[in-house]
């Protein structure tokens, strides 16, 4: 496999994409963030797009939250499963993230959850999402970074830190494949990748009140009891940032939280 060859059957390689319980839990978390950012009770009347939808569980949750929902992916086996189960309420299409089959300014909400590291051209994907998102619309981002201690796809410590050849060798020695495909950006690189958006960081709000954001499955109870300064000190060790990016200048419109979202600069 070449370094950035497209992954055309990702759900066949990563069983976690078919774990319905965990995927729906992730969906509830991201919907809670979106609702707070937009200051809405549900997504009724909004048009939503899940980029990299695979088997469709997150897209289905968006639809059940009231949004007219679309899902795109190049993972045709995953899309076949999605259409079979959820095709009556979600429009699923085979499409690349850098060539979305939607008009300019046509989406209110876009989801890009743990996807950028797995696509051939992240910059092109992010640019085309910006094109289809309406002014004032939001892009939900679940983004890992290069310095995460535990790499989330293969659950191997420090894997994303390594040069390609060493990462491939590590993966083989661990019995988890032959080629490490994912490519993570540093935190500074992530800020550059999403520089066209007004980005707000919800990572600390989720850590401070995981129940409100349906994150209590992954956030230990003791973490939520830490003061804000201590939570902020933990941020470099957090493997996934929870960001909400507005097209144009925007700010969260939901009620006050125990810890407020911070603008990413």
Residue ranges of each PLM-predicted region?
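A short SAM/SAH-binding and catalytic strip from SAM-dependent methyltransferases
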Residues: 109-120
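Conserved N-terminal segment of class I S-adenosyl-L-methionine
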Residues: 1-103, 109-111, 238-241, 251-265
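A short glycine-rich, Lys/Arg-flanked "PGG" loop and its adjoining helix->strand segment in the class I
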Residues: 123-138
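Short conserved AdoMet
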Residues: 64, 87, 120, 134, ...
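A C-terminal cap/extension of S-adenosyl-L-methionine-dependent methyltransferases
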Residues: 187-265
């Amino acid at each position: 496999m070449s370094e950035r060859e497209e992954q055309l059957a990702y759900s066949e390689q990563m069983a976690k994409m078919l774990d319905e319980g965990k995927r729906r839990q992730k969906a509830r978390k991201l919907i809670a963030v979106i609702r707070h950012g937009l200051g809405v009770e549900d997504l009724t009347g909004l048009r939503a797009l899940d980029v990299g939808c695979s088997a469709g569980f997150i897209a289905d949750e968006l639809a059940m939250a009231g949004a007219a929902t679309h899902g795109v992916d190049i993972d045709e086996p995953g899309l076949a499963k999605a259409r079979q189960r959820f095709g009556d309420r979600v429009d699923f299409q085979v499409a690349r993230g850098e060539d979305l089959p939607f008009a300019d300014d046509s989406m209110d909400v876009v989801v890009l959850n743990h996807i950028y590291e797995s696509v051939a051209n992240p910059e092109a994907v992010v640019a085309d999402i910006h094109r289809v998102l309406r002014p004032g619309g939001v892009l939900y981002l679940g983004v890992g970074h290069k310095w995460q201690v535990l790499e989330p796809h293969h659950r191997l410590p420090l894997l994303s830190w390594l040069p390609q050849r060493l990462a491939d060798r590590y993966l083989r020695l661990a019995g988890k494949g032959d080629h490490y495909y994912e490519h993570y950006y540093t935190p500074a690189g992530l800020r550059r990748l999403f520089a066209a958006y007004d980005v707000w960081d919800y990572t600390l709000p989720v850590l401070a009140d995981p129940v409100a954001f349906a994150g209590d499955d992954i956030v230990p109870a003791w973490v939520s009891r830490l003061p804000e300064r201590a939570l902020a000190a933990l941020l470099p060790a957090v493997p996934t940032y929870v960001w909400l990016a507005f097209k144009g200048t925007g700010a969260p419109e939901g009620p006050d939280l125990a810890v407020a979202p911070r603008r990413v600069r």
